[in-house]
């Protein structure tokens, strides 16, 4: 799945401690996307780095805007991801 787009998505709001990362991982895996999701140290943001076909990446972004039931998403920022890392699946990172 080397073709497609790579983006970095920052989701802000009540998105930590509400199952947001698991929600994103589950949907990204179902969509066949690669990358990762992690909490950011500010306590109110989650970073998603995702790679795959544009239509599937856009579907994940739509899902991120909604989030799981306990989440309250205030904003979603999307930018191109310029990293060189090759992803072999979609994971939750704890760094």
Swiss-Prot record:
Cited InterPro entries: Acylphosphatase (IPR020456), Acylphosphatase-like_dom (IPR001792), Acylphosphatase-like_dom_sf (IPR036046), Acylphosphatase_CS (IPR017968)
Stored Pfam families: Acylphosphatase
Record domain Acylphosphatase-like: where: 6-94
Keywords noted in UniProt: Hydrolase
Catalysed reactions, semicolon-separated: an acyl phosphate + H2O = a carboxylate + phosphate + H(+)
UniProt keyword annotation of Hydrolase present: yes
Transport listed as a keyword: no
Active site: 21, 39
Enzyme Commission number(s) of this protein: 3.6.1.7
MF terms in GO: acylphosphatase activity
Similarity remark: Belongs to the acylphosphatase family.
Protein name: Acylphosphatase
Organism: Caldivirga maquilingensis (strain ATCC 700844 / DSM 13496 / JCM 10307 / IC-167)
Gene name of the encoded protein: acyP
């Amino acid at each position: 799945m080397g073709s497609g787009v790579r983006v970095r998505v920052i989701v802000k709001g009540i998105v930590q401690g509400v199952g947001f990362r698991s929600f994103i991982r589950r949907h990204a895996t179902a969509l066949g996307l690669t990358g990762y999701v992690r909490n950011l140290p500010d306590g109110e943001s989650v970073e998603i780095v995702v790679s795959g076909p544009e239509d599937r990446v856009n579907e994940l972004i739509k899902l991120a805007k909604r989030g799981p039931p306990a989440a309250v998403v205030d904003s979603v920022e999307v930018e191109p991801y310029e990293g060189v890392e090759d992803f072999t699946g979609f994971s939750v990172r704890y760094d």
